[in-house]
Amino acid sequence: MFKRYLSSTSSRRFTSILEEKAFQVTTYSRPEDLCITRGKNAKLYDDVNGKEYIDFTAGIAVTALGHANPKVAEILHHQANKLVHSSNLYFTKECLDLSEKIVEKTKQFGGQHDASRVFLCNSGTEANEAALKFAKKHGIMKNPSKQGIVAFENSFHGRTMGALSVTWNSKYRTPFGDLVPHVSFLNLNDEMTKLQSYIETKKDEIAGLIVEPIQGEGGVFPVEVEKLTGLKKICQDNDVIVIHDEIQCGLGRSGKLWAHAYLPSEAHPDIFTSAKALGNGFPIAATIVNEKVNNALRVGDHGTTYGGNPLACSVSNYVLDTIADEAFLKQVSKKSDILQKRLREIQAKYPNQIKTIRGKGLMLGAEFVEPPTEVIKKARELGLLIITAGKSTVRFVPALTIEDELIEEGMDAFEKAIEAVYA
């Protein structure tokens, strides 16, 4: 239990966590012996209990440039004293600059070659909602029956009703009854001929296809280049809009600015979405479309109150400038090599516990034979924060700026946790 505590930076008093959580809806499961009070790059601090942690979660792939990034804090302070919000009734320079920058940097760094327009919103699920609406609008303009969406098993696209409808895990969907209709789930492991047959047979009913280039919540599964390339060809031939969800795997996380930059240009999506790292913890998201999609949209087709506000855009402009840099991305790949090397060494020591290591860049997963709940708990006791993905995979998504020595220290703690659990 937390003892009553007066923070040095806030007048807020912590009573017991049980008393505190009585005021929050019951939608999260959190450890009751941990309350984060501050952070610094890839470390988090619990000043209530006098503990510190190496953070391999980065707020679930959000704080790509680290906790308490001083430049982000400076930008927020400056912009908050200038203009926070003026609505989407009017242009603001920060929003215009960011939209142009996303399009230009995307093309420069091998992403969507025909990127054209940007819709700014506040969260990943919102960005995916916009993508689904845009794809459906494009389809319905061609044929009123062309409004279905194809998604994939093990996918996760969000928890609002549209994004939830294309999220695979039934535990998220079934409690809420009927969701958005005309959604089909296919298996990415199926042969291309089977996928092609399904899409061709239902081409007059399918408006869009949504896929994560690297499935995150489903277990850190990178989709093969050949599979994504084949899917784009099939969809293009059948006038189906391809959406890539890069909420988690985008913005340098894969070692490239966008995960779809590993693909040939002809396989690039018609729409892709970004959030999480886009604001380094400040809420902002984006839906990026090509001109084919934009041509289907009209004034009033979509909107958002806070999306593209100057405060969020000012931070995002800095984030994009920092990550869209060859030297920065090379450092991500270098850090990935360090982390992968240690993971494979640990796997070699515990082959009966760890089945495989997979992922790209600093989005890696270690799949265990059994659910790694106790390993994660023990790691936390040893000062390391890690999370799961899927049923039995430990996910590693640290800040892209994590120090090399912290990677080593974190992996030492991970190995000790495995040893303690399986000794």
Curated annotation (Swiss-Prot):
Keywords: Amino-acid biosynthesis, Aminotransferase, Arginine biosynthesis, Mitochondrion, Pyridoxal phosphate, Transferase, Transit peptide. It is found in: Mitochondrion matrix. GO terms for molecular function: identical protein binding; N2-acetyl-L-ornithine:2-oxoglutarate 5-aminotransferase activity; pyridoxal phosphate binding. Gene3D superfamilies: Aspartate Aminotransferase, domain 1, Type I PLP-dependent aspartate aminotransferase-like (Major domain). The modification N6-(pyridoxal phosphate)lysine is found at residue 276. The keyword Mitochondrion applies. Residues 1-13 form a transit peptide. Pfam families: Aminotran_3. One of its GO terms (cellular component) is mitochondrion. catalyzes the conversion of N-acetylglutamate-gamma-semialdehyde (NAGSA) to N-acetylornithine in arginine biosynthesis. Belongs to the class-III pyridoxal-phosphate-dependent aminotransferase family. PANTHER family: ACETYLORNITHINE AMINOTRANSFERASE, MITOCHONDRIAL, AMINOTRANSFERASE CLASS III. This is Acetylornithine aminotransferase, mitochondrial. The lineage of its organism: Eukaryota, Fungi, Dikarya, Ascomycota, Saccharomycotina.
